[in-house]
């Protein structure tokens, strides 16, 4: 494996810039997302129905905008300029939320700015893949270390978000997020490289080959949506399941999430290290096997000790699919890293939308335990689908 460090320079400054940019954008996002429902309820005085509608519209807008942008990002323009534009939209969005309490403004202009801002992260990973390929670096390990920065950001961001919002107010929270995006703009402008485009795979007629026309890409997308539906159902339902059904302390939910997020980081790095030797498909199947054990354990065990122990399987599941899953899309769509990365992130967003509907319906009609039995079945289905995707 080609090292990320060189003999001439102990640390590659471009590598550090990618790490810093992904971490800071991740922290800025992790500052805003965890307390958004609280902000809408307390500051905007939105009813629960309008809070749910905001999240749904926001997710759908993010999918639509990212698909439209990704279609053009691989064929024209400077990808770094696009990232700068998206970060500028994120900066404006943070300022809007800091000083506006009008629901209609937030669900229209705010959602539009948020959708444009959400493109920044997949485009940074696409630029990183192009840089790694051009400079003959190990793309898998490079992307895995970058993805670990996001996990680290989500270890730090949520507790900091609640601390800022509850102790200093939401204006301070969103101003801090805006400041982080401003620093990111300067960092990206002066440190990230512009990388010449690779030629995308073409179909007869001279047009780029759509990922949807590829059976393996379609199958992997459906499998990825299924995986992220499982994960999001767990995130939504777990705090309620622990406190209402199991009667365990509410603070345990935060401890479980923090433990899993912390364990994901070494899992991602190990997956990146062994990806070339083991193969991406085999790693994804290992992740899904861990996911199957995780959801089966949630359905069958109820003690605090068991739930903590199960987080190891959860970390293996999410730690691998979050990093290797994205790289698998990129390898299946050569020359189109922007579209491939966006397809991966859209599978996450689609899973989030489906999970919200499914979790609410199941838990209300059949109880919280039904959510985990369904997640188990979906994980098995995702395993079967992933096993049929080409190993590249």
Regions found by a protein language model. Give the residues of each.
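Helix-loop boundary and gating motifs at the non-cytosolic
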Residues: 5-59, 231-242
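Hydrophobic core of transmembrane alpha-helices in multi-pass small-molecule transporters
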Residues: 23, 104-121, 225, 306-320
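Intracellular juxtamembrane helix-capping segments at the cytosolic ends
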Residues: 118-133, 320-333
């Amino acid at each position: 494996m080609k090292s990320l460090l060189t003999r001439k320079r102990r640390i590659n400054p471009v590598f550090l810039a990618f790490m810093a940019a992904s971490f800071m954008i991740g922290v800025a996002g992790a500052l805003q997302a965890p307390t958004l429902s609280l902000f809408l309820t307390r500051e905007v005085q939105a009813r629960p129905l309008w809070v749910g509608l905001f999240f749904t519209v926001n997710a759908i807008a993010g999918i639509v905008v990212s698909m439209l942008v990704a279609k053009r990002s691989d064929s024209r323009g400077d990808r770094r300029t696009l990232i700068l534009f998206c970060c500028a939209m994120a900066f404006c969005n943070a300022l809007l939320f800091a000083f506006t309490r009008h629901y209609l403004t937030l669900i229209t202009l705010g959602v539009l700015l948020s959708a444009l801002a959400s493109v920044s992260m997949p485009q940074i990973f696409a630029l990183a893949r192009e840089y790694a390929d051009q400079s003959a670096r190990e793309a898998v390990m490079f992307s895995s270390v970058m993805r670990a920065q996001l996990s680290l950001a989500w270890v730090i961001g949520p507790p900091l978000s609640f601390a800022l919002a509850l102790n200093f107010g939401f204006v301070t929270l969103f101003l801090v997020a805006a400041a982080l995006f401003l620093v990111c703009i300067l960092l990206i402008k002066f440190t990230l490289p512009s990388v010449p485009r690779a030629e995308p795979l073409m179909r007869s007629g001279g047009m780029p080959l759509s990922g949807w026309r590829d059976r393996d890409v379609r199958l992997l997308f459906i499998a990825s949506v299924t995986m992220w539906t499982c994960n999001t159902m767990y995130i939504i339902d777990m705090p309620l399941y622990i406190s209402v059904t199991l009667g365990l302390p509410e603070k345990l939910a935060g401890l479980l999430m923090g433990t899993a997020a912390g364990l994901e980081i070494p899992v991602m790095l190990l997956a990146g290290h062994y990806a070339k030797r083991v193969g991406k498909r085999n790693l994804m199947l290992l992740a899904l096997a861990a996911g199957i054990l995780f959801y089966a354990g949630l359905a069958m065990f109820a003690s605090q000790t068991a739930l903590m122990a199960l987080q190891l399987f959860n970390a293996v599941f999410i730690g691998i699919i979050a990093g290797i899953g994205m790289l698998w899309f990129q390898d299946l769509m050569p020359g189109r890293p922007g579209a491939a990365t966006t397809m991966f992130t859209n599978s996450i967003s689609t899973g989030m939308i489906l999970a919200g509907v499914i979790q609410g319906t199941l838990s209300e009609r059949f109880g919280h335990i039904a959510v985990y039995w369904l997640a188990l079945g979906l994980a098995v289905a995702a395993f079967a689908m992933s096993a049929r995707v080409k190993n590249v």
